[in-house]
Amino acid sequence: MDKPRKENEEEPQSAPKTDEERPPVEHSPEKQSLEEQSSEEQSSEEEFFPEELLPELLPEMLLSEERPPQEGLSRKDLFEGRPPMEQPPCGVGKHKLEEGSFKERLARSRPQFRGDIHGRNLSNEEMIQAADELEEMKRVRNKLMIMHWKAKRSRPYPI
């Protein structure tokens, strides 16, 4: 009788091991790379859309996707749908129509942009002097560019 008991005791030991006791099964390199990519994608999504902001951003994203297509609108309808511009784009507008040189217009516009100068208390004379320096630098630069252009093209062979 002692022998059957010993056999019974040995059988549970030879029984299949549980998940905890099994050595980890190694995945193929392809599966590992896929898992790494998916974890990288999740981390990048978390960086762009943290979980706290997702409930706030979701309605805006959904609204932006639900816009009806505007392909059927004519050019006239498109321009009527836009709000009027407050100021014309750069290079177009009233400053082209104003009379006077660049220096005079700069001196006149100084009070409007007093806050844009960031702590520099410049008088009108200083502003005009700075404008003169800028114009002189432009002239010198243009002369150098012309001289370079002429020197480059006056040779019988390219450099």
Swiss-Prot record:
GO cellular component: nucleoplasm
Official protein name in the record: Transcription elongation factor A protein-like 1
Keywords annotated in UniProt: Nucleus, Transcription, Transcription regulation
Region Disordered, annotated ranges: 1-99
Pfam families from the UniProt entry: BEX
Biased composition (Acidic residues): 37-54
Protein family: Belongs to the TFS-II family. TFA subfamily.
Intrachain disulfide bonds: none
Listed Basic and acidic residues bias regions: 17-34, 64-80
Function: May be involved in transcriptional regulation. Modulates various viral and cellular promoters in a promoter context-dependent manner. Does not bind DNA directly.
Keyword Transcription: yes
